[in-house]
């Protein structure tokens, strides 16, 4: 009886389903195909005309073949229950039922591509990879998404050495089975015409194609010459210092001016936090081996005043899956929905399932796809004052006094109802966290934000962490790609150097840029470009 019922249901599902399997991108990995083979009939009893539905253009990422739709509404439920954005819905009834966007708008959320994965048929497929390859032709490669600090697990599917598509790889501890559109579709940039495919050397003001040996030798010669000059200058400075000590005289103004005009022998390396751990480690080892500690990966940061007391590495302070178990959270300087979409899904689960009190302090109002307890938006220069007010409320709850480093800011803060509410929610929660986001890391008073946020976390017994810029900021610190520490946070016997802000005012003899576009990736890009062009 059960099998007969299943066969009958399959007949209904297949009544209007077209025989598109030979040309459908879902062919070979289609759930409807699998179920039809197991429970379907060899011959259909249906002889009437099949339903035809005109396809909708719902954006540049998803292709619709709505005649194939079996009205399971998985895509609708994903938007409503998981993503928190109702972009797709079903209109009409019976045979006239139709999956579509509301008011014929485009699907443009940060997680829209997951509708492709949950669709059991070929009604929703990836537009960039349409008709590019069959599922069984492609080779599957495990890798990690490189666009944020979450590190979503993915599969890259290739055909004859060409990337065809990227799909999520299940990992319950990180991205579960979901993937952001940025991680899913960014592979299209791999074959961009703007990318270099061969080394180039500028000769007489023009870029010329070169072979690898010539390019690498040129770079090695320039850094070697700078290192030799630096060694000579260091020896001369030491000899001059010894002579001054012997004569017990300070250098004259003329001697000081002459020293300033000396040809610069400073070397530097600016490395991207999207680089691999191996690249970052080798870059700092190369530069320090040449006698310079001027290496930095914190390219978007401008306040380095507290780097001497910073942790070994900036990290979340908890497991990613712990985010969905929170009862309260305060995110400072974070548009987490766009910057770390997978982390935002976890916070949404906490807000919807646990009724967690999630609060934000930002320089502008951002849209979030879950209930927000407190959403404070102030001018960027007022963020420290607002955070100090929350800290004041937290100290009042704990009964402790603020440490000397922040006592002045806390005592002058004007505490409002929203500040009290945030502190109370963190204090009352069984599981709470305070997190600094990308915007906080780029703030001109980042050190003040950090010390205040840490104080709030301590007084309310919350965890403290960072949602960092790029894919591998923590790895960059661990690898020693910062000027004040070596690998694994070591401080002993390490050649220290200048941070990126100081280097923008420095004359450089040689500079290594690793995965960096200096005119867009650096906080003070204008000053750096002037330094590099000097």
Where are these regions (language model features)?
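Flexible inter-domain linker/hinge segments
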Residues: 32-58, 144-158, 218, 227
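Short hydrophobic beta-strand motif reused across regulatory alpha/beta modules
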Residues: 88, 124-125
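Signature of N-terminal electron-transfer/Fe-S-associated modules in redox systems
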Residues: 1-52
């Amino acid at each position: 009886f059960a099998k007969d019922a299943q066969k009958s249901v399959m007949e209904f599902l297949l009544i209007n389903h077209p025989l598109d399997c030979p040309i459908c991108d879902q062919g070979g990995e289609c759930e409807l195909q699998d179920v039809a083979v197991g429970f379907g009939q060899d011959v259909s009893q249906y002889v009437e005309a099949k339903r035809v539905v005109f396809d909708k253009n719902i954006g540049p990422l998803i292709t619709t073949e709505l005649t194939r739709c079996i009205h399971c509404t998985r895509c609708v439920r994903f938007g409503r229950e998981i993503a928190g954005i109702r972009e797709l819905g079903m209109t009409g009834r019976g045979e006239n039922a139709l999956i579509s966007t509301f008011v014929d708008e485009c699907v443009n959320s940060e997680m829209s591509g997951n509708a492709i994965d949950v669709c059991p048929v070929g009604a929703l497929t990836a537009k960039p990879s349409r008709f590019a390859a069959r599922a069984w032709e492609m080779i599957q490669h495990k890798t990690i998404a490189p666009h944020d600090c979450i590190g979503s697990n993915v599969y890259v599917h290739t055909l004859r050495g060409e990337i065809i598509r990227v799909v999520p790889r299940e990992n319950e501890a990180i991205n579960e089975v979901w993937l952001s559109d940025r991680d899913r579709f960014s592979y299209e940039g791999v074959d961009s015409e703007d990318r270099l495919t061969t080394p180039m050397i500028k000769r007489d003001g023009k870029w010329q194609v070169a072979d690898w040996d010539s390019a690498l030798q040129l770079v090695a010669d320039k850094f070697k010459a700078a290192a030799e000059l630096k060694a000579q200058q260091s020896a001369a400075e030491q000899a001059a210092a010894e002579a001054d000590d012997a004569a017990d005289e300070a250098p004259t103004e003329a001697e000081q001016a002459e020293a300033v005009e000396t040809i610069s022998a400073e070397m530097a390396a600016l490395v991207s936090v999207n680089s691999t751990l191996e690249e970052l480690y080798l870059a700092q080892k190369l530069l320090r081996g040449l006698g310079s500690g001027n290496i930095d990966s914190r390219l978007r940061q401008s306040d380095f005043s507290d780097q001497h007391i910073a942790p070994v590495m900036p990290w979340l302070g908890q497991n990613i899956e712990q985010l969905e178990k929170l009862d309260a959270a305060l995110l400072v300087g974070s548009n987490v929905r766009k910057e770390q979409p997978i982390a935002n899904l976890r916070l949404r689960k906490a807000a919807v399932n646990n009724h967690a009190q999630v609060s934000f302090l930002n320089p502008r109002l951002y849209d979030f796809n879950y209930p927000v307890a407190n959403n404070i938006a102030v001018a960027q220069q007022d963020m420290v004052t607002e955070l100090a007010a929350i800290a004041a409320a937290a100290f009042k709850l704990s009964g402790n006094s603020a440490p000397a480093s922040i006592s002045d800011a806390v005592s002058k803060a004007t505490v409002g109802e929203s500040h009290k509410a945030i502190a109370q929610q963190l204090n009352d929660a069984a599981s709470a966290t305070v997190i600094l986001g990308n915007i906080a890391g780029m703030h001109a008073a980042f050190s003040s934000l950090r010390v205040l946020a840490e104080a709030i976390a301590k007084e309310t017994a919350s965890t403290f962490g960072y949602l960092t810029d790029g894919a591998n900021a923590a790895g960059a610190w661990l690898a020693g790609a910062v000027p004040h520490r070596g690998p694994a946070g070591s401080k002993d016997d390490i050649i220290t150097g200048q941070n990126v802000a100081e280097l923008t005012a420095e004359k450089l003899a040689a500079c290594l840029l690793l995965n960096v576009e200096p005119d867009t990736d650096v906080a003070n890009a204008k000053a750096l470009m002037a330094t590099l062009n000097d």
